[in-house]
């Protein structure tokens, strides 16, 4: 498909069963309320298994003990993952104390998991604790509405929003966009918060009765940082400033990383530039992009339903013109912007208001008390005394934001004593994994549990070749759905089977190029052997300041992906 040969605006054919399920759900109610009272199973049945996703939950089970339980003729140990809605990752210390308590007392694993979509997840919530978790969140001004399934998910925003006036304004827009695109159904309030059914007809003016064809992800990004990885997202607002003040956004549409092994109709894709818009049109444009995808997205094949596929089918210019028509504007030409990096600046950074921000590296975002490193207790102690707020970053780290000079030493002392400020290598700081085993039902290979020891070995290779002070953006994702964003890394590992990964090379440091598969279905020793040779070559042959990904392309080791819809699989 190309601009010259656009496909149909709407794909005709038999709708997927998910479309039937949404239509029959009575605006996402289903029979969830009744299912909650069924004590015969630890899970949700039938359509409710999928409907709870619209309420921010996934039903999972512990895969480490799945076979053992099957032998004992027991059902899997069902438990829910809950993902909070937290635009821009900002959470108050009061909210943090509440989630710390819930995680410790009411989840199987006792941990808080920071995600690369700037929010937190609880893993291992038993069915009896599902309603209490929603009520706990509500009591501190939070919710889990629309953080999963066919909605606009948690809206990301470049971290450190108080570092300048620009950051503060961008964060406010992230919140506004999130609120504007929320579903209007009262199902969430009725089921979880016991609010009375009101005798009015539900309406979904933006999302429609069957919601979106597939998940939809939005970011607000402040150059030169691309910490939120805009090219992994459907709709991106790139902040444009004049004299330090936000004046508008460049809009980029149609990024996304999920693929299916061996299915050449699926591909990762970077977002396309649509144009510049002044601030006052932001919500109208956001709504227009969402409703165009609502109406034109493929509802006959969920593997081909995301915005990136709609753009390729109808053509970028056609989609853009429809957004202009619906929003009642004409995009101006893209304003200049550039990215220089996407990692977090670990440690103390001083803001323009003379307050300090402390970015803590949290490996894999997993907050738990480890032997000799009581991370969870340490953060709770900081939350009890800190007057500012916490900010979760898209790199799964945590910022203690807005610390006055007078409080700095006290907070640093707790952080150091809790193992929250242990020195790590630049390589570890720039490596990331999704959750994968044991809780993710889609996992094909280990990711979070694999990464720490794998990076030990990579650190040894970096030292061997004299590049320990450098880093390679390295990511591991347990399956091709790609939550670990490996398809925007310089080195991406995509899980294929237990202990086996596809090795992708040729992305870049700033996250604007999709990496190509270099070797398929290989083991950790094979991965390390390949990287040993390639890191050695990079160390010897690179040009000044040349990142590993750019080197692999320039040296002809891997062909760059220039047009992923057509050449990703070549």
Curated annotation (Swiss-Prot):
Siroheme binds at residue 483. GO terms for biological process: cysteine biosynthetic process; hydrogen sulfide biosynthetic process; sulfate assimilation. One of its GO terms (molecular function) is 4 iron, 4 sulfur cluster binding. Keywords: 4Fe-4S, Amino-acid biosynthesis, Cysteine biosynthesis, Heme, Iron, Iron-sulfur, Metal-binding, NADP, Oxidoreductase. Binds 1 siroheme per subunit. Binds 1 [4Fe-4S] cluster per subunit. Its cofactor is siroheme; [4Fe-4S] cluster. InterPro entries: CysI, NiRdtase/SiRdtase_haem-b_fer, Nit/Sulf_reduc_fer-like_dom_sf, NO2/SO3_Rdtase_4Fe4S_dom, NO2/SO3_Rdtase_4Fe4S_prot, NO2/SO3_Rdtase_4Fe4S_sf, NO2/SO3_Rdtase_FeS/sirohaem_BS. It catalyses: hydrogen sulfide + 3 NADP(+) + 3 H2O = sulfite + 3 NADPH + 4 H(+). PROSITE patterns: NIR_SIR. Its EC number is 1.8.1.2. The keyword Heme applies. Component of the sulfite reductase complex that catalyzes the 6-electron reduction of sulfite to sulfide. This is one of several activities required for the biosynthesis of L-cysteine from sulfate. This is Sulfite reductase [NADPH] hemoprotein beta-component. It comes from Escherichia coli (strain SMS-3-5 / SECEC).
């Amino acid at each position: 498909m190309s601009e010259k040969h656009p496909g149909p605006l709407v794909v005709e054919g038999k709708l997927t069963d998910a479309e039937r399920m949404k239509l029959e759900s009575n605006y996402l109610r289903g029979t969830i309320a009744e299912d909650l009272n069924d004590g015969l199973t630890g899970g949700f049945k039938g359509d409710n298994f999928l409907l709870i996703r619209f309420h921010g939950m996934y039903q999972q089970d512990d895969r480490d003990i799945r076979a053992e339980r099957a032998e004992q003729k027991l059902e899997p140990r069902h438990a829910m993952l809950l993902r909070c809605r937290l635009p821009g990752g900002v959470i108050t210390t009061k909210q943090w104390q509440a989630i710390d308590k819930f995680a410790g007392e009411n989840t199987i694993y006792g941990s808080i998991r920071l995600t690369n979509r700037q929010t937190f997840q609880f893993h291992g919530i038993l069915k009896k604790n599902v309603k209490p978790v929603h009520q706990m969140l509500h009591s501190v001004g939070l919710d889990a509405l629309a953080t999963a399934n066919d909605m606009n998910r948690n809206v990301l925003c470049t971290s450190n929003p108080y570092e300048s006036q620009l950051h503060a304004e961008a964060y406010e827009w992230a919140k506004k966009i999130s609120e504007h695109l929320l579903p209007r159904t009262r199902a969430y309030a009725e089921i979880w918060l016991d609010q009375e059914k009101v005798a009015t007809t539900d309406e979904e003016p933006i999302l429609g009765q069957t919601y979106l064809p597939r998940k939809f992800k939005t970011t607000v990004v402040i150059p030169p940082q691309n910490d939120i990885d805009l090219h992994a997202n459907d709709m991106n607002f790139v902040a444009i400033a004049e004299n330090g003040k936000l004046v508008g956004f460049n809009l980029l549409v149609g990024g996304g990383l999920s693929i299916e092994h061996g299915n050449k109709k699926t591909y990762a894709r970077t977002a396309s530039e649509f144009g510049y818009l002044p601030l006052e049109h932001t919500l109208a444009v956001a709504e227009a992009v969402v409703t165009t995808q609502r109406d034109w997205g493929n509802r006959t094949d969920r593997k081909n339903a995301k915005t990136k596929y709609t753009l390729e089918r109808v053509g970028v210019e056609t989609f853009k013109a429809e957004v202009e028509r619906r929003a009642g504007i004409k995009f101006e030409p893209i304003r200049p912007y550039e990215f220089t990096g996407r990692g977090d600046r670990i440690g103390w950074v001083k803001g323009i208001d003379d307050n300090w921000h402390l970015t803590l590296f949290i490996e894999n975002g997993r907050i738990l008390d480890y032997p000799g490193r009581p991370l969870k207790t340490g953060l709770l102690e900081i939350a009890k005394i800190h007057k500012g707020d916490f900010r979760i970053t898209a790199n799964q780290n945590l910022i203690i934001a807005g610390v006055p000079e007078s409080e700095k030493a006290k907070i640093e002392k707790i952080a150091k004593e809790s193992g929250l400020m242990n020195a790590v290598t630049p390589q570890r700081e720039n490596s990331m994994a999704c959750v994968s085993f044991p809780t993710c039902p889609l996992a094909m290979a280990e990711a979070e549990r694999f990464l720490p020891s794998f990076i030990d070995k990579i650190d040894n290779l970096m030292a061997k070749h004299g590049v320990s002070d450098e880093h390679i953006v390295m990511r591991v994702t347990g399956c091709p759905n790609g939550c670990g964003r490996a398809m925007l890394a310089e080195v991406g590992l995509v899980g294929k089977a237990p202990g086996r990964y596809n090795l992708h090379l040729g992305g870049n440091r700033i996250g604007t190029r999709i990496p190509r598969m270099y070797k398929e279905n290989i083991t950790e020793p094979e991965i390390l052997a390949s990287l040993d040779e390639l890191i050695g070559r990079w160390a010897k042959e690179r040009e000044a300041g040349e990142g590993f990904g750019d080197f692999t392309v320039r040296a002809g080791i891997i062909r760059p992906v220039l047009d992923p819809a057509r050449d990703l699989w070549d």
